[in-house]
Amino acid sequence: MSLGVLAAAIAVGLGALGAGIGNGLIVSRTIEGIARQPELRPVLQTTMFIGVALVEALPIIGVVFSFIYLGR
């Protein structure tokens, strides 16, 4: 196993770990906000989905960079 494959696996794994933690924090804070002010649910959910999408973009970019690196 080459070091390039190991580096790509670590990059993808850490990206997924960070995204999982970030998504958990985003969703938990959104639920807390909805519990405090239920009338703001639509606004908070919209903001949550945008935040989750931005956080999920990072592991996808990591996978793409790993494939590009391994393709060389």
Swiss-Prot record:
Q: Where is this site: Reversibly protonated during proton transport?
A: E56
Q: How does it sit in the membrane?
A: Multi-pass membrane protein
Give the location in the cell: Cell membrane
**InterPro entries in alphabetical order:** ATP_synth_csu_bac/chlpt, ATP_synth_F0_csu, ATP_synth_F0_csu_DDCD_BS, ATP_synth_F0_csu_sf, ATPase_proteolipid_c-like_dom, F/V-ATP_Csub_sf
- Which superkingdom, per the lineage? Bacteria
Q: Which molecular-function annotations from GO does this UniProt entry contain? A: lipid binding; proton-transporting ATP synthase activity, rotational mechanism
- Report whether Nucleotide-binding shows up as a keyword of the record: no
What residues form the membrane-spanning segments? 1-21, 48-68
The entry's cellular-component GO terms read: plasma membrane; proton-transporting ATP synthase complex; proton-transporting two-sector ATPase complex, proton-transporting domain
Positions bearing N-formylmethionine: M1
The answer to keyword Transport applying to this record is yes
| One Pfam short name | ATP-synt_C
List keywords of the entry alphabetically: ATP synthesis, Cell membrane, CF(0), Formylation, Hydrogen ion transport, Ion transport, Lipid-binding, Membrane, Transmembrane, Transmembrane helix, Transport
What functional role does this protein have? F(1)F(0) ATP synthase produces ATP from ADP in the presence of a proton or sodium gradient. F-type ATPases consist of two structural domains, F(1) containing the extramembraneous catalytic core and F(0) containing the membrane proton channel, linked together by a central stalk and a peripheral stalk. During catalysis, ATP synthesis in the catalytic domain of F(1) is coupled via a rotary mechanism of the central stalk subunits to proton translocation. Key component of the F(0) channel; it plays a direct role in translocation across the membrane. A homomeric c-ring of 10 subunits forms the central stalk rotor element with the F(1) delta and epsilon subunits.
- Additional information: Dicyclohexylcarbodiimide (DCDD) binding to the active aspartate residue inhibits ATPase in vitro. Fusion proteins corresponding to c(2), c(5) and c(10) permit ATP synthesis in reconstitution experiments with F(1) and in the absence of F(1) function as a proton channel; other fusions of c(3) to c(14) do not.
| HAMAP family, sorted | ATP_synth_c_bact (MF_01396)
Q: Which family does it belong to?
A: Belongs to the ATPase C chain family.
Describe the subunit structure: F-type ATPases have 2 components, F(1) - the catalytic core - and F(0) - the membrane proton channel. F(1) has five subunits: alpha(3), beta(3), gamma(1), delta(1), epsilon(1). F(0) has three main subunits: a(1), b(2) and c(10). The alpha and beta chains form an alternating ring which encloses part of the gamma chain. F(1) is attached to F(0) by a central stalk formed by the gamma and epsilon chains, while a peripheral stalk is formed by the delta and b chains.
Protein name, entry field: ATP synthase subunit c
The gene for this chain is atpE
